[in-house]
Amino acid sequence: MRSHFCTEISEKDVGKTIKVAGWCNTYRDHGGVVFIDLRDKSGLVQLVCDPSSKAYEKALEVRSEFVLVAKGKARLRGAGLENPKLKTGKIEIVLEELVIENKSATPPIEIGNKSVNEDLRLKYRYLDLRSLNAYEIFKLRSEVALITRNALAQKGFLEIETPILSKTTPEGARDYLVPSRVHEGEFFALPQSPQLFKQLLMVGGMDRYFQIARCFRDEDLRADRQPEFTQIDAEMSFCDEDDVMGVVEDLLQEIFKAIGHTISKPFKRMPYKEAMENYGSDKPDLRFELPLIEVGDCFMDSSNSIFSNIAQDPKDKRIKALNVKGADAVFSRSVLKELEEFVRQFGAKGLAYLQIKEDGIKGPLVKFLSEKGLKNILERTDAQVGDIVFFGAGDKKIVLDYMGRLRLKVAETLDLIDKDALNFLWVVHFPMFEKTENGYHAAHHPFTMPKNIECEDIEEIEAHAYDVVLNGVELGGGSIRIHKEEMQKKVFEKININEEEAQKKFGFLLEALKFGAPPHGGFAIGFDRLIMLMTKSNSIRDVIAFPKTQKASCLLTDAPSPINEEQLRELHIRLRKPI
């Protein structure tokens, strides 16, 4: 039906008969001469038709998004009529034949216009996908999937599919449940990850497994979350953390070659505690400096009892400083107020600061600091004339969080972030357990191998876990797994899962661990998030063919939707109004 894709045509084809096919991107009638920009997956080429052509009458019928097959001779555009914005901007096709394969209603959205309301774009996603940018995104997504398969296959990994219909084993988020018609009153769950099945594959001697897996989590959505998503999932036997990290680094190096980036190995490693204390995040963005600096001891003799009391509780409280170089000349009073309102959203009671000026130190904190305390702060933060030093004080968790967010906000405001840089990082030595209102739970998941399970302080027990971070975004992570039944039971006990509950939820795993499970570990990389970063897309929805909204609905198909009474009866389900 066609001899060329649109952008395959070049000056060397001048004089040749060309046949192309695609959609009408734009249509113009200039004094009887018709110009059509034809679009296919590769890009645009201009078709031109004057009244002497036998295709002229057909050309007059063409409108936006009509499906066309065109035949004609390639020629150079006239002097001064070239379009440097197009790859084919020096040539055009003089129409000899034109077939309208299909007509189109007036499109409700402008193809490729990102300023169109996103809900409207999602409702007409099949039109939104016609944009050249969308095609490039999904072309790269396909290439990365192929690179992943080839790279892992070369390392001896087998691609094995694990079940989609499984048992509910909550891993932090809520499960999506599927009622069983055959087993009345019982439910399958869609997998939040293939975690337990891939461990069972290691017990089964598969040695190295991977899949590009679909996962499902019924959780509150954010800009980078979807209820169904894809991850590169892998597991390997007889390995340690270095082995797994090496596989991930090799894989990411191959993947980023696809967009022309050379990645240096090994990646930097940073302990979790260092990441939190110095950057206020377990996924720090290291494309810029601005570390958080501990200055609690500088407030020991503060005349402000709030600060001095915080300083005397270094286990649960923090006073952190953030020196922003040159900020005094840039941050007006209104900007400082905006920054204060920003951190208040995350639990701050205010935002104290010192302005380092030619005529001395200004700011609300000066009067509360001793001469020695002020001197130590200036030295420790390397504060110079023109700088502003911000302070956060209070509960450790809250302070680290909002000061970490302030660090990012300031970097964005001052344009300190190199948008083209790729800064990979491993965060390691995670805590095994985290405290909640209902006791402790596993920080990653309860199948992670602890390092020092006998430690009396549960908060000091570390996990054999690791996260890979790119530019402040968690790409993925993994851990070395528990491969002995006794250790798995100990971990369950720590998170208040008694033996009866453990058997009910995870009995099949505990049974498998009795039969000589090998040491094993693995990782998962968020595939959608990876493509979002590689394409510099604004939203994860841009890199998923048919995504859900932030309310977990599909505007295209109007899902979820009600089902009829007959379907409910077959599933032994009766609905009642929420109380």
Curated annotation (Swiss-Prot):
As recorded in UniProt, its EC number(s) are 6.1.1.23
InterPro entries per record: Aa-tRNA-synt_II (IPR004364), aa-tRNA-synth_II (IPR006195), aa-tRNA-synth_II/BPL/LPL (IPR045864), Asp-tRNA-ligase_1 (IPR004524), Asp-tRNA-ligase_1_N (IPR047089), Asp/Asn-tRNA-synth_IIb (IPR002312), AspRS_core (IPR047090), GAD-like_sf (IPR004115)
Q: Which is one Pfam family of this protein?
A: GAD
Check the record and name the CDD domains matching this protein. Answer: AspRS_core, EcAspRS_like_N
Name the GO cellular-component terms: cytoplasm
Q: NCBIfam families, from UniProt?
A: aspS_bact, PRK00476.1
Query: What does this chain do?
Result: Aspartyl-tRNA synthetase with relaxed tRNA specificity since it is able to aspartylate not only its cognate tRNA(Asp) but also tRNA(Asn). Reaction proceeds in two steps: L-aspartate is first activated by ATP to form Asp-AMP and then transferred to the acceptor end of tRNA(Asp/Asn).
Q: What is this protein called?
A: Aspartate--tRNA(Asp/Asn) ligase
- Which organism is this entry from? Helicobacter pylori (strain J99 / ATCC 700824) (Campylobacter pylori J99)
Q: What is the lineage of its organism?
A: Bacteria, Pseudomonadati, Campylobacterota, Epsilonproteobacteria, Campylobacterales
